[in-house]
């Protein structure tokens, strides 16, 4: 969902409850041990029976075992263990810490303390919680996604894992506003760069020769972590992916307090367009998609709201500066096509407009649907599958009416020319007073 338009497994079963444990995470006790302890199977106080109690001891069939000390809870495959049980003290891993370059390295002591006091409480804990959920879900997904799966299976598997790890299933009123999915899972194939998720009945299947951008978000109390990666099975696309990953990392390196957006865009474009990719004997320069941008992230507002800023991925233009305390999605898109996207295909993504006008609605279906959207999503983006999941039906007329009245925005898929291939990588960064934190960084990208 993160893309902002410039103005102008075999069989994957991510829903399966089976699977071996994947990732050891420091915590106290294992899930199995805790369950046994609660049933009384383990008892440290039990020793050898006294002489007068030998009969009672013989009758006791449960085998006495010592508690295992130091064992760690683990995440399952697919991910289903709520993250708070793996980190009982709410001490979630920090992201990659990067010092500011040159003149941005020095911040006055009092200013730093004031801001750190504000950031080192719920703000950072909630962001790091969301980021760790994103890492665990995507790292499993990158291993599990295979050709032959439907896009619906892939998207819903990721979403089910996010709901499980955050502990917010999203079926009760207001549940999704407390935490969970921040926007619909984008599974964008080939020339489609962004904003595509399957609607109900979609039968599209992932093929070996496809290039798929997977873009999903996690939030805790409106603190949104927005990160994306690209999957390609055919090594012919390796240079395309390398170009975009390099460009995103270049943007992250350049970003910082008082840095101009135009300078970041120029560095991103230079990095990306130094690559080319050969497909079926033809060489294609990798072009930065000039009308897609990174962006600020606000609380419950993926594009930062009315005061949001854009981070270009080409040179020229905006002289606006980044500021301390801001949160950014640094994302880049590369293409073998024209390097320009347009609206295409069936719309699936929608979002209620912050401070939308108070328009009298004549259609009762529109009124009812607006109430559902407000109570379940607020200003977080949603898709038609999410409305289906809440039991809504025959809502398209009302939804289109909300769009027509300027209350809800529609976000159609954004595509380059057919036959081209696009790639995306994205991270969320926090501009802390003395360092920037790449909150979504992982071992994978």
Curated annotation (Swiss-Prot):
A divalent metal cation 1 binds at residues 215, 226, 426. Residues 57-71 have a biased composition (Basic residues). Gene3D superfamilies: Creatinase/methionine aminopeptidase superfamily (3.90.230.10), Winged helix-like DNA-binding domain superfamily/Winged helix DNA-binding domain (1.10.10.10). One of its GO terms (cellular component) is cytoplasm. Binds 2 divalent metal cations per subunit. Has a high-affinity and a low affinity metal-binding site. The true nature of the physiological cofactor is under debate. The enzyme is active with cobalt, zinc, manganese or divalent iron ions. Most likely, methionine aminopeptidases function as mononuclear Fe(2+)-metalloproteases under physiological conditions, and the catalytically relevant metal-binding site has been assigned to the histidine-containing high-affinity site. It catalyses: Release of N-terminal amino acids, preferentially methionine, from peptides and arylamides. It is found in: Cytoplasm. It holds the Pfam family Peptidase_M24. Substrate binds at residues 195, 303. Keywords: Aminopeptidase, Cytoplasm, Hydrolase, Metal-binding, Protease. Its main location: cytoplasm. It is an enzyme of class 3 (hydrolase). GO terms for molecular function: initiator methionyl aminopeptidase activity; metal ion binding; metalloaminopeptidase activity. One of its GO terms (biological process) is proteolysis. Its EC number is 3.4.11.18. A divalent metal cation 2 binds at residues 226, 295, 331, 426. Residues 1-80 are annotated as: Disordered. Its cofactor is Co(2+); Zn(2+); Mn(2+); Fe(2+). Belongs to the peptidase M24A family. Methionine aminopeptidase eukaryotic type 2 subfamily. Cotranslationally removes the N-terminal methionine from nascent proteins. The N-terminal methionine is often cleaved when the second residue in the primary sequence is small and uncharged (Met-Ala-, Cys, Gly, Pro, Ser, Thr, or Val). PANTHER family: METHIONINE AMINOPEPTIDASE 2. This is Methionine aminopeptidase 2. It comes from Paracoccidioides brasiliensis (strain Pb18). The lineage of its organism: Eukaryota, Fungi, Dikarya, Ascomycota, Pezizomycotina.
């Amino acid at each position: 969902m993160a893309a902002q338009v410039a103005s102008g497994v075999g069989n994957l079963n991510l829903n399966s409850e089976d699977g071996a444990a994947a990732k050891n995470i420091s915590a106290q006790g294992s899930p199995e041990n805790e369950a046994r302890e609660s049933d009384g199977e383990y008892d440290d106080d039990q020793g050898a029976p006294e002489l007068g109690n030998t009969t009672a001891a013989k009758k006791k069939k449960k085998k006495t075992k010592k508690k295992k000390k130091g064992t760690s809870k683990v995440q399952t495959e697919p991910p289903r263990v709520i993250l708070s049980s793996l980190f009982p003290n709410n001490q979630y891993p920090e992201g990659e810490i990067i010092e500011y370059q040159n003149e941005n390295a020095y911040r006055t002591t009092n200013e730093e303390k004031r801001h750190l006091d504000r950031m080192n409480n719920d703000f950072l804990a909630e962001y790091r919680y969301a980021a760790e959920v994103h890492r665990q879900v995507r790292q499993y997904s990158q291993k599990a996604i295979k050709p032959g799966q439907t896009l619906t299976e892939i998207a819903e598997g990721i979403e089910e894992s996010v709901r499980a790890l955050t502990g917010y299933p999203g079926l009760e009123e207001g549940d999704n506003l407390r935490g969970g999915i921040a926007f619909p899972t984008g599974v964008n194939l080939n020339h489609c760069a962004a904003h595509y998720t399957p609607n109900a009945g979609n039968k599209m299947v992932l093929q070996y020769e496809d290039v798929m951008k997977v873009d999903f978000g996690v939030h805790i109390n409106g603190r949104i972590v927005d990160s994306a990666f690209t999957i390609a099975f055919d090594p012919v696309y390796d240079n395309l992916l390398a170009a975009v990953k390099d460009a995103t990392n270049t943007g992250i390196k350049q970003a910082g307090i008082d840095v101009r957006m135009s300078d970041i865009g120029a560095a991103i474009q230079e990095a990306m367009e130094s690559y080319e990719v050969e497909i079926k004997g033809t060489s294609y320069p990798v072009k930065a998609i000039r009308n897609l941008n990174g962006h600020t992230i606000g609380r419950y507002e993926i594009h930062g709201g009315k005061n949001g800023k854009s981070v270009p991925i080409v040179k020229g233009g905006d002289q606006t500066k980044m500021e301390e305390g801001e949160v950014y999605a640094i994302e880049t898109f590369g293409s073998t096509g024209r390097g320009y996207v347009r609206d295409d295909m069936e719309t699936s993504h929608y979002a209620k407009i912050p401070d939308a006008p108070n328009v009298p609605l004549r259609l009762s279906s529109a009124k009812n649907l607006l109430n559902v959207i407000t109570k379940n999503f607020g200003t977080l983006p949603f898709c038609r599958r999410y409305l289906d999941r809440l039991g809504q039906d025959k809502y398209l007329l009302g939804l289109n009416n909300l769009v027509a009245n300027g209350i809800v925005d529609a976000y159609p898929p954004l595509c380059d020319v057919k036959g081209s291939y696009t790639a995306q990588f994205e991270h969320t960064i926090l501009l802390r007073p003395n360092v920037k934190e790449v909150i979504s960084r992982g071992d994978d990208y």
